[in-house]
């Protein structure tokens, strides 16, 4: 059968939810449900069909938004969030190759291309040297002779800020959430323009700053 590359983002472990412990707990629960599904530790409502799909996942790509550690966050909260992520990535990397991209809220440089997160954040997970990779944003890789190129979304968000692209421009074949239509429309335009970040460096920080 076919293989799947699983794309996921927005774990935002460490997010305080403006002091809302329930929101923080919900974020952790969602992340753990995802890990359990990918590693086969839990089943979904659809039963065998979903389990079969999970078994076909050959790589997980975490497209940014892994952490949301505020500058004014206390040490205990930050340390706890990093430990949670380390455990989560250890579970994933023990079952399937994982690429962790940097993103907008992650502790790395903000200009594109963003450098990989430092291995010191994930001492246990990075022991899986063959399956746990901390990678740049944008990130390109190949699976079974199929090439992938992706970002953590800053380029798409910036295009939407400074263009008239909106949900009505999305393809009629798009069957996803209506809230994602404008982003999908902007993403498809970057393919037509053959430019990953057309608004850089004017409104999206990048390096080098000029040709």
Feature names for model-found ranges:
Residues 1-211:
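Extended recognition/assembly regions associated with phosphoester-bond processing machinery
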């Amino acid at each position: 059968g076919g293989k799947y590359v699983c794309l996921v983002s927005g774990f935002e472990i460490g997010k305080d939810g403006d002091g809302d412990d329930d929101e923080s707990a919900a974020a952790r629960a969602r992340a753990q449900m995802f890990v359990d599904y990918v590693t086969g530790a839990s089943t979904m409502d659809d039963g065998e069909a979903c389990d079969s799909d999970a078994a076909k996942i050959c790589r997980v790509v975490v497209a940014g938004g892994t952490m949301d550690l505020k500058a004014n966050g206390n040490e205990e909260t930050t340390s706890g969030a990093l430990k949670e992520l380390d455990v989560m990535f250890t579970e994933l990397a023990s079952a399937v190759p994982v690429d962790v991209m940097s993103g907008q809220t992650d502790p790395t440089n903000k200009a594109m291309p963003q450098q990989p997160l430092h291995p010191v954040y994930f001492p246990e997970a990075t022991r899986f040297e063959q399956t746990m990779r901390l990678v740049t944003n944008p990130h390109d890789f190949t699976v079974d002779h199929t090439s992938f190129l992706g970002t953590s979304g800053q380029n798409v968000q910036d295009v939407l800020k400074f263009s008239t692209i909106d949900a009505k421009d999305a393809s009629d074949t798009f069957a996803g959430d209506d809230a994602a239509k404008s982003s999908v429309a902007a993403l498809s335009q970057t393919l037509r323009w053959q430019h990953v970040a057309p608004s850089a460096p004017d409104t999206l920080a990048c390096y080098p700053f000029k040709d």
